[in-house]
Amino acid sequence: MMLDLGPFSDEKFDAKRWVNSSCQARHPQDSLEKHLVDLEMKLQIASEEIGASLEEQSGGALLRVPRATRDVLRLRDDAVSLRGSVAGILQKLKKAEGSSADCIAALARVDNVKQRMEAAYKTLQDAAGLTQLSSTVEDVFASGDLPRAAETLASMRNCLSAVGEVAEFANVRKQLEVLEDRLEAMVQPRLTDALTYHKVDVAQDLRVILIRIGRFKSLELQYSKVRLKPIKQLWEDFDTKQRANKLANERSESQRLSSGDEFQSTSSQTSFASWLTSFYDELLLYLEQEWKWCMVAFPDDYMTLVPKLLVETMGVLGASFVSRLNLATGDAVPETKALAKGVMDLLSGDLPKGINIQTKHLEALIELHNVTGSFARNIQHLFAESELRILIDTLKAVYSPFESFKQKYGKMERAILSSEIAVVDLRGAVTRGVGAQGIELSETVRRMEESIPQVVVLLEAAVERCIGFTGGSEADELILALDDIMLQYISMLQETLKSLRVVCGVDGTGDGVGSKKDASAEKRESSRKMDLTSNEEWSIVQGALQILTVADCLTSRSSVFEASLRATLARLNSSLSISLFGTNLDHNLSHLKSEQTAGDLSMAGRASMDVAAIRLVDVPEKAHKLLNLLEQSKDPRFHALPLASQRVAAFADTVNELVYDVLISKVRQRLGEVSRLPIWSSVEEQTAFPLPNFSSYPQSYVTSVGEYLLTLPQQLEPLAEGISTNGDSNNEDAQFFATEWMFKVAEGATALYMDQLRGIQYISDRGAQQLSVDIEYLSNVLSALSMPIPPVLATFQTCLATPRGELKDVMKSEAGNELDCPTANLVCKMRRISFD
């Protein structure tokens, strides 16, 4: 058994643990005593071996110390000697550097002189070559060898750049420019012929010549000039066909008039929208052919030549295109078609009054824009290999004819919506007369309620038109227009409410100040109103309650529309933020590499093909303004239609005020003269028998009010059922609605009654008993409606029911603490009770 000494070197060595583990590792047949003896003997032997080894190694180390000391001393002496040698070498190097610095400087000057001499020699060679080229260039031109002439002119240009601004060669520089123009003029006819007849080899050779003399721009211009001719002819075919059709129609009309028959012309004017589709199809086919031909003829330039051709085309056709678009919008409406005018003429105010911009005008423009959008998508696919900047410029040129219309989109939309809102009829067309007010009110309320979804549909259509026509780039103008139109519509509703107040009999009756009516006339007028109320009061009440549904519908529909508008703005924010590259907008597209193509464009590059981004990418101020607005739409507190939201709330308040005035009008009418009733001051008649001669029943004025209040829940029930559709929550809302209005009217009636009671100057004992009965009846009605009795009304009832001689004692008793003191004192004053 070998003894492992490893555990003894561990700093955390535990002797007890080591002994226990050794005992556990013994053979089962060995006794513990024997194992411990063997272990002790092995430890002792190992200890002796370690001690002997240490003694031997220590002796050897002592013998090596003197030798090592001598070696260290020798190395120290060598180091001192080496340091001295190095110091001497450094001193010699410093001396050598000082003596050779002048030599090196002289050599540097000589080298500079050599370089200048070589440059001068080369310049002289270039000058000599330039002189020789100048003398032989005419011969080269005379030979008609255009490639050689191009090489000669290129060599002259290189020589001139080497010579620099030397006065002696100023004439040569001018001569070179003249020669380059001359060579370009010689190339152009051949280039025109090569482009016209699609001569690939000739076109390539001429391209090399133009590039050699730095006139590649001439190739672009000549290419566009040649290729534009068939496109312009294609564009002018529309006017030619229109004139031909017009002449044919006039000829047919003259023949019909001369012959007297009913012959009708079969020829008709071709609409610009249908013609534009065919024009775009033919133009796209033409560009596809050019793209393929240029890929062969100009493999390095086709990705710029063909897009620039389209840009030049749209530039040449721009004014005519805008004019045709304008006339095409006018053709959508007979009035403007007859005058040969369009939407731009309407906006400028050149047409007679009564002819306004209609939805059809803008829809026709959007249809043409959609046709152009389809063409633009095909162009994007065709030019996908071109650089992003070139592609965006090309698509911007395609949409350029619509730019003037887009800039006036807000004005167009506002005019369209304003005219559409103006034709909304909110008044019920009913002849005034007895029994007609209720019908007129009901019809007007019905029309008001039906107009709300109609107006919302108009606003939603405007949002769709904005997205379809401008891609959302005019969203800020759209919001302003929608807000203004909503204000216009709500103003119409407010004016209608004012007229309904007259219909309902709660306004427009005059204040009576300065009235010249005599007493009999006033009595007849009051009688007529009473008759009218008895016949129509409940129909007017029902009609007035229906106005609440108008306010509720307007509030809910406007809220839903505004939420939908915010969602639309949020979607625009997401798409435009990506399209316009965020903060890189100020730099436009400069962060994209010039060699980057659509094949490896980033997401932002691909999204930039959006019609709105194409329009905004070069107008960062407008883009940032729009993005700021769209970013604000994310805030839950944001109101897309801020002014309209305020006016909707104000309209709801006005409706509530009108409904309350209608519901309280009968109460106001019945209680209007209560404080001046003669019964309050009447006295008891003297009779031979002590019998009461006052009425123990409530008077008609208070029973009429009570019956009205008790009947009111039945009138509110149909409207509450209309609010409650499905679900317990809606039922609870309906119950709350009915209860709320019931309490409003009851509280108002109670307040009016108490005001009349306060106006009584004197009341007799008989009058007090009668008024106590009236108040008790009204209190019972309020209790039946689950309304608390106001303390003031309860005080009136208590003080009036108490006999005159006992009132002082009641007020001084504990029961008097429950009374309203000012009211109790007022009753005492009415009953002429003094506390002195």
UniProtKB/Swiss-Prot annotation:
Highest rank taxon of the organism: Eukaryota
PANTHER family linked to this entry: CONSERVED OLIGOMERIC GOLGI COMPLEX COMPONENT 7, CONSERVED OLIGOMERIC GOLGI COMPLEX SUBUNIT 7
Region (Disordered): 246-265
Signal peptide per UniProt: none
Organism: Arabidopsis thaliana
Protein known as: Conserved oligomeric Golgi complex subunit 7
Functional description taken from the UniProt entry: Required for normal Golgi function. Necessary for embryo development and pigmentation, especially for the expansion of cells and organs, and for the formation of the organized shoot apical meristem (SAM). Probably involved in the generation of the extra-cellular matrix.
GO cellular component: Golgi membrane; Golgi transport complex
Coiled coil: 29-49, 107-127
Biological process per Gene Ontology, one example term: embryo development ending in seed dormancy
Location in the cell: Golgi apparatus membrane
Gene giving rise to this polypeptide: COG7
Alphabetized UniProt keyword annotations: Coiled coil, Golgi apparatus, Membrane, Protein transport, Transport
Entry keyword Coiled coil: yes
Family: Belongs to the COG7 family.
